[in-house]
Amino acid sequence: ITINVKCTSPQQCLRPCKDRFGQHAGGKCINGKCKCYP
């Protein structure tokens, strides 16, 4: 699930993904946007 959060590294996506989808969510940075894996 791509969310509207800009990023340059996967670390920047972990917090917003966990906030939205819970503790077990992961995140990647793809094309400058965060993609979450709930």
Swiss-Prot record:
- Where exactly is the site Basic residue of the functional dyad? 28
Indicate the annotated site residue(s) for Aromatic residue of the functional dyad: 37
Q: Does the keyword Secreted apply?
A: yes
Q: Which Pfam families match?
A: Toxin_2
Q: Which cysteines are joined by disulfide bonds?
A: 7-29, 13-34, 17-36
Q: Which GO CC terms are listed, alphabetically?
A: extracellular region
Q: In which tissues is it expressed?
A: Expressed by the venom gland.
Coiled-coil ranges per UniProt: none
Q: Which PROSITE patterns match?
A: SCORP_SHORT_TOXIN (PS01138)
Q: Which InterPro entries match?
A: Scorpion_toxin-like_sf, Scorpion_toxinS_K_inh
> What keywords were assigned to this record?
Disulfide bond, Ion channel impairing toxin, Neurotoxin, Potassium channel impairing toxin, Secreted, Toxin, Voltage-gated potassium channel impairing toxin
Gene Ontology terms for molecular function: ion channel inhibitor activity; potassium channel regulator activity; toxin activity
Tell where it localizes.
Secreted
Domain remarks in the Swiss-Prot or TrEMBL record = Has the structural arrangement of an alpha-helix connected to a beta-sheet by disulfide bonds (CSalpha/beta).
Return the similarity comment: Belongs to the short scorpion toxin superfamily. Potassium channel inhibitor family. Alpha-KTx 02 subfamily.
Q: What does this protein do?
A: Inhibitor of voltage-gated potassium channels (Kv). It is capable of displacing the binding of radio-labeled noxiustoxin (AC P08815) to rat brain synaptosomes with high affinity (about 100 pM). It is also capable of inhibiting transient potassium-currents (resembling I(A)-type currents), in cultured rat cerebellar granule cells. About 50% of the peak currents are reduced by application of a 1.5 uM solution of this toxin.
Other remarks on record? This toxin is found in the venom of both male and female C.limpidus.
* Name of the molecule in the record: Potassium channel toxin alpha-KTx 2.3
